[in-house]
A protein has these predicted regions:
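Non-catalytic, glycine-rich low-complexity segments
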Residues: 1-41, 155
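Aromatic-rich carbohydrate-binding modules that target alpha-glucans
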Residues: 31-92, 102-168, 188
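Cap/lid segment of the alpha/beta-hydrolase catalytic domain
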Residues: 184, 213-279
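Short beta-strand element of the alpha/beta-hydrolase
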Residues: 197-200, 207-218
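Active-site nucleophile loop of the alpha/beta-hydrolase fold
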Residues: 217, 249, 317-327, 356-358
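Alpha/beta-hydrolase fold nucleophile elbow
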Residues: 283-296, 316
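Short glycine-enriched nucleophile-adjacent loop
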Residues: 299-310
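The feature captures the conserved acid-bearing segment of alpha/beta-hydrolase catalytic domains
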Residues: 324-391
Length: 413
């Protein structure tokens, strides 16, 4: 290990671990210009000898199941309770990770040929053993697969100041938490029921407030509560007073059928849900101020809604959109819609992001953005050094809302 902590002669001692805890993990040190070495650590609770044989490191976009190579395990420093692994990344990287200690080697170790599908299945089998990094000073959270994960923000990563209170564990005292109300949507068209949340960030002119629909709303309401950051940006004048509708999509089977290019879902939203929401929380009906925002399948759904109902949804915020759907390696359904003329005649305001470490999504996003620009839409596109990861989505979601609603806050800017 190259980190200066491993040059000490008391590695693994209680004072050494106390020093590690004060600094926080992973240990981060600059190497060459714009790059940093990250050293991940895990302390074996059984001491220098135990039944733990591997501590797998699942870093989104670096060592996770989407990567072509073999999974990576920390290695024990001989004669100590210290397990460690290091890598080097560009300074703009941001990502989440978890540690998975297990009592046996993986079945694929020693095999000459790697079976990607077999490795994916193996990952799923060990996910229940995942744990967040107890030495990471920032608050952990439940990721999309229900895993406890921790986050890393390298020094040059885009700023996320609005999330500082969450990272420091202060979200329970954040402004805006009391303005989030939960309801239940019973859909006759879809034949199902789910929770939804409505957040209000101000009441000065209720009928003029814009509306934002956030897909995967249960994540933004509970796992990564967005109410405080939104309220904070509103109070700073960066966002207008608004209504936010957070729609639950946590059922994986329903999510896979409702979000990818499903007209019934969006007709149900327009015919059943939005009239109820307007009764609970009055807001403007103008398409130009209505945003649909989502990630992954939700990112696909957001752009699908805007292209097919531009008279209702004039803005789309799409992050890591699954534009390859329904089959990887072929032009997706949205490309077919654009070929058929969708998106022409009514310019949209679009904010699209993709991660540099999610190759299929990145390739499809670049191709789709080119087509959308040819149609003349007002479009902001960003590529982020990260994987398929809510840790950077949360910052881009706020940035996108600020950008899309900028005419409402500073019409002359």
């Amino acid at each position: 290990m190259n980190d200066s902590f491993f040059q000490r002669d008391d590695v693994g001692s209680e004072p050494w671990w106390q020093a590690v805890a004060c600094r926080g993990t992973p240990l981060i040190e600059p190497t060459t210009a714009g790059r940093y070495r990250l050293t991940f650590l895990w302390r074996d609770p059984a001491g220098a000898s135990s039944g733990i044989q591997r501590v797998w490191l699942n870093i989104t976009g670096v060592t996770d199941h989407h990567q072509p190579g073999l999974p990576q395990s920390l290695a024990r420093v001989p004669g100590t309770d210290v397990w460690t692994w290091e890598t080097e990344l560009a300074g703009r990287w941001r990502g989440s990770y978890c540690l998975i200690p297990v009592g046996e080697p993986a079945p694929f170790e020693g095999e000459a040929k790697v079976d990607p599908q077999g490795i994916r299945l193996w990952w799923r089998s060990v996910f229940p053993l995942a744990q967040a990094d107890r030495l990471n000073p920032r608050r952990s959270w439940q990721g999309g697969r229900g895993l406890a994960v921790s986050g890393v923000h390298l020094p040059d990563a885009p700023a996320q100041a609005a999330w500082t209170a969450f990272d420091e564990g202060l979200d329970g005292r954040e402004a805006g938490a009391s303005d989030l109300r939960q309801y239940r949507w019973d859909s006759a068209r879809l034949g199902n029921s789910r929770p939804i949340w409505v957040l209000t960030t101000g009441n000065t002119t209720p009928e003029e407030r814009p509306l934002a629909i956030l897909l995967d709303g249960q994540f933004w309401a509970q796992a990564m509560p967005i109410s405080g950051p939104l309220q904070r940006l509103t109070e700073r004048g960066l966002l207008p007073e608004a209504i936010y509708l957070l729609i639950d999509n946590s059922d994986r089977a329903l999510r896979g059928s409702e979000l990818p290019c499903n007209p019934d879902f969006w007709l149900a939203v327009q015919e059943e849900l939005l009239p109820q929401v307007r009764a609970w929380a009055p807001h403007a009906l103008t398409a130009a101020s209505t945003v649909v925002a989502g990630q992954s399948f939700g990112g696909l759904a957001a752009l699908y809604a805007a292209l097919h109902w531009p008279e209702r949804f004039g803005c789309a915020l799409s992050q890591s959109g699954s534009f390859w759907w329904p089959q990887r390696g072929t032009p997706g359904r949205l490309f077919e819609a654009l070929e058929a003329g969708k998106g022409t005649g009514q310019p949209l305001r679009l904010f699209i992001e993709a991660g540099l470490r999610e190759p299929a999504i990145l390739e499809a996003s670049r191709a789709l953005v080119e087509r959308l620009r040819e149609q003349g839409h007002a479009l902001d596109y960003r590529e982020i050094d990260g994987g398929h990861d809510a840790l950077w989505w949360r910052g881009g979601l706020l940035d996108g809302l600020v950008r899309l609603w900028q005419p409402l806050v500073a019409p002359d800017r």
